[in-house]
Structure formats: C-alpha cells, structure tokens
C-alpha cells in the first residue's frame, strides 16, 4: 500500500454533528413504502453529496486524497469515569431519529467512504488522533464540523470548515469566540466550563473573564499556582476553592490525541463512487431527487437501466 505523502489532503467529517444538523434543520420525512422515518438520513446524504462535490473543486488548498466520516460510538465515554455528570444533562435521541442511525451508517458505505467510530471515545477524540498522525507526516487536513470543541486543533496544516456557516474558520473567528488563540482555547474552556456538556468550570467565571486571566497568566496551571496573588477578593477565593473543578474540566475538554484507532490513515483513501451501490441505496430509501442529482453527476449506473435495478430489488423481496 502506498505511503502517505506530504501532498496528501485528508477530509475528516464530524458525522455525529452532521446527523443532528440534518435532523433539526429539515422537516420530517418518512419512506412511503413502510413509514420509516428518513428525514435525517436524507439530509445527511444530501450534505455528504454536496461536500464531496465541493471538495473536488477546492482551489484554496488541494482536492482531498483521503476522506473519512467519524461518529460517536455511544453516550458514555472515558470522560464519564473522570466526571460522572459529564453530559448527564443530555436527553436521549428523539424516537424518530434513533432508528435512522443504522441507515446513516449504511449511507456512508453507499458513498464508498470509510466510517470510523470507537467505543469509549467521542468522534472529536478520533479526529484529534488522526490530525496528530497526519501532521506528523506533514500532510494537510480539513476538519468539517461546527463543533467549537474542535477549534483547539486549529494550527498550521489544519483547516476547519463550518458547514452551518458555510465558511472556513479563521484565527480571528477563534479569538472572537474565546478571546485567545487556538492554543489556549482549552484553558479558557477549563475555566468557563460548558453547560451544554455539563462541564463545571469555575463558578462565576465566563469566557470573557477566563480569556483575560489566561492572556495574563499564560496557562490554567500557572493561573492556579498564582491565584493567591489576584487582587479581587471574590475572584481569588473562587479560583482557590474551585481549583479541582478547573483541573477536572481541563481533562474533560482536552481531546485525546492517542486514541487506539485500528483504522489506519491508508485505509481512509478516497475511492471512486460505486454507482450501482449508491443508486441502489438511494432507491431503497426512496430519495428520488437525490438519486436524480447523483445520476446527473456520476452518470448512468452500470446496470442496463434504473428500472432494471428496481426489478432486481423486487426479486430479492421475500
């Protein structure tokens, strides 16, 4: 198998983020033949199709040579062992979304793309691990996600594309959000906490104050070591009393860059679309509009006709 080259370009897709964006951004949809909810699957496929085509015309860096869709494996991860209340405020997936997860994973296979997930780890950790491996080789990577937690990975050789805003994130965007550069995002998050993930942080300290403190002291550890020097009584006492919460929060927000992923970089190579496989899936899901777009983009299937493909499927039914 060919070695990874410095000219290679990896696209790492936050698949879990795509799922929830597809579910909440689009109206409900069901498959007419059996009533299966398919709105999230349809939206996911449409976004993936668009991303694949847009990435092939990437003029800012280069076209992708490798591509992977990365998913969360389960709600519980190693972070729950560090802090039992981590994400405890999250509700279960909606009843009409849960049955769609299986088909979303099947859709990635239909597009002939590798998907990656690992028990006990979040998608963000796997992305961070791949980024670390890619940068060590000297190749480039584009992360596709609207998740602010991935901003800590921004550096030379790494781009972040926000599909919600349809733009690439810049260093200025990160500074505007966190008040610090990307290398210090973790420290700000450790102090400010994150209510959406139930990360405690330090009570009474928000992002703005956290940024001021980190810009002044450099790191969370240096700040906590010098907390007794802070002149504001309340702030000083709060930091001293909540030192452990801040340190635990840092463990929670720091992405793992050494997750034990078994799927290697070479396995992420971008393959040609298998038209028969993709069109069969789209027809089974009754995504007629997307099927039409796919045929227009990739050409007619190898089977004699689309209707012939339908006959084959009908014969397979019990």
Model-derived features: positions:
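Noncatalytic, basic helical substrate-engagement surface that gates or grips nucleic-acid strands
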Residues: 2-144, 148-170, 245-248, 254-262, ...
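Non-catalytic nucleic-acid-binding/docking modules located in mid-to-C-terminal regions
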Residues: 5-7, 56-68, 113, 136, ...
């Amino acid at each position: 198998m060919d070695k990874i080259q410095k000219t290679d370009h990896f696209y790492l897709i936050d698949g879990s983020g795509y799922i929830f964006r597809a579910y909440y951004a689009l109206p409900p949809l069901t498959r007419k033949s059996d009533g299966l909810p398919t709105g999230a699957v349809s939206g996911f496929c449409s976004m993936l199709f668009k991303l694949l085509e847009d990435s092939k015309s990437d003029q800012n860096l280069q076209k992708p040579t490798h591509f992977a869709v990365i998913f969360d494996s389960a709600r519980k991860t190693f972070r729950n062992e560090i802090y039992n209340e981590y994400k405890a405020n999250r509700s279960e997936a909606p009843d009409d979304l849960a049955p769609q997860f299986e088909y979303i994973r099947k859709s990635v296979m239909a597009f002939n793309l590798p998907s990656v997930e690992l028990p006990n780890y979040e998608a963000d950790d796997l992305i961070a691990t791949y980024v670390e491996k890619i940068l060590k080789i000297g190749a480039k990577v584009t992360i596709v996600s609207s998740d602010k937690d991935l901003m800590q990975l921004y550096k030379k050789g790494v781009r972040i594309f926000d599909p919600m805003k349809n733009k690439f994130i810049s260093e200025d965007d990160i500074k505007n959000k966190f008040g610090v550069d990307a290398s210090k995002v973790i420290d700000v998050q450790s102090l400010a906490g994150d209510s959406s993930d139930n990360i405690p942080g330090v009570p009474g300290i928000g992002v703005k104050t956290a940024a001021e403190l980190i810009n002044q002291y450099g790191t969370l550890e240096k700040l906590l070591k010098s907390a007794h020097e802070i002149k504001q009584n309340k702030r000083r006492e709060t930091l001293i009393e909540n030192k452990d919460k801040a340190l635990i929060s840092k463990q929670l927000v720091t992405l793992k860059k050494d997750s034990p992923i078994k799927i290697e970089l070479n396995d992420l190579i971008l393959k040609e679309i298998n038209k028969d496989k993709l069109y069969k899936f789209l027809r089974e899901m009754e995504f007629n509009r997307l099927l039409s777009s796919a045929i227009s983009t990739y050409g007619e299937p190898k089977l004699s006709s689309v209707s012939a493909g339908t006959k084959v499927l009908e014969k397979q039914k019990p």
